[in-house]
Amino acid sequence: MALRVVRSVRALLCTLRAVPSPAAPCPPRPWQLGVGAVRTLRTGPALLSVRKFTEKHEWVTTENGIGTVGISNFAQEALGDVVYCSLPEVGTKLNKQDEFGALESVKAASELYSPLSGEVTEINEALAENPGLVNKSCYEDGWLIKMTLSNPSELDELMSEEAYEKYIKSIEE
């Protein structure tokens, strides 16, 4: 019993980091780095995926040569409640700036333009039954199409998120 009490008191002191003697160090905690430990930063395609924007308010993220395309928050707010999405068929080949579909809302209709050249590999089927996803989650569940990129260097011509925010401010003035 006395040993159990000593262990309990020691555990409490270790928790508080008030160990009475250096001869009895606290056991290492699994989440702490030991002496001489090295921490590494891992980078991978998911971490390096950056959202890029066009002047027509489409965005694209890329991973392993596949681009996911949607519209920006600014665009969905300007449109209002989206009630219909017209999207291309899988296999459609697009050049940069080609019109590939349209969004209709209670306020307006807006054409969609491809931010990059490539071939449509997937469309967001959920938008057929729930086009409002574009409003609710324009950067996640409200994406429009996925496409293979035929010219990945075109990404360099698109705006970063920071540059896009400056662009939005300039057109709102």
From Swiss-Prot:
Mark the residues carrying the PTM N6-lipoyllysine. K107
Where is the transit peptide, renumbered to this chain? 1-48
Q: What's a BP term from Gene Ontology annotated to this protein?
A: glycine decarboxylation via glycine cleavage system
Q: State the needed cofactors, names only.
A: (R)-lipoate
Is the keyword Transit peptide assigned to this protein? yes
CDD domains of this UniProt entry?
A: GCS_H
| SUPFAM superfamilies registered for this protein in UniProt | Single hybrid motif (SSF51230)
Keyword annotations for this protein, in alphabetical order, are: Disease variant, Lipoyl, Mitochondrion, Neurodegeneration, Transit peptide
Q: What is its main location?
A: mitochondrion
Tell me how the cofactor is bound: Binds 1 lipoyl cofactor covalently.
- Superkingdom of the source? Eukaryota
**PROSITE patterns registered for this protein in UniProt:** BIOTINYL_LIPOYL, LIPOYL
Q: Where's the Lipoyl-binding domain?
A: 66-148
> InterPro entries of this UniProt entry?
2-oxoA_DH_lipoyl-BS (IPR003016), Biotin_lipoyl (IPR000089), GCV_H (IPR002930), GCV_H/Fam206 (IPR033753), GCV_H_sub (IPR017453), Single_hybrid_motif (IPR011053)
> Where does this polypeptide localize?
Mitochondrion
**Which GO CC terms are listed, alphabetically?**
glycine cleavage complex; mitochondrial matrix; mitochondrion
Q: Which PANTHER family match?
A: GLYCINE CLEAVAGE SYSTEM H PROTEIN, GLYCINE CLEAVAGE SYSTEM H PROTEIN, MITOCHONDRIAL
Q: How does it assemble?
A: Interacts with GLDC. The glycine cleavage system is composed of four proteins: P (GLDC), T (GCST), L (DLD) and H (GCSH).
Q: Which disease is it linked to?
A: Multiple mitochondrial dysfunctions syndrome 7: An autosomal recessive disorder biochemically characterized by glycine accumulation in body fluids, including the cerebrospinal fluid, with an elevated cerebrospinal fluid/plasma glycine ratio. The broad clinical spectrum ranges from neonatal fatal glycine encephalopathy to an attenuated phenotype of developmental delay, limited verbal communication, behavioral problems, seizures and variable movement problems. Death in infancy or early childhood may occur.
Its function? The glycine cleavage system catalyzes the degradation of glycine. The H protein (GCSH) shuttles the methylamine group of glycine from the P protein (GLDC) to the T protein (GCST). Has a pivotal role in the lipoylation of enzymes involved in cellular energetics such as the mitochondrial dihydrolipoyllysine-residue acetyltransferase component of pyruvate dehydrogenase complex (DLAT), and the mitochondrial dihydrolipoyllysine-residue succinyltransferase component of 2-oxoglutarate dehydrogenase complex (DLST).
The identity of this protein, by name, is Glycine cleavage system H protein, mitochondrial
Give the organism the record lists. Homo sapiens
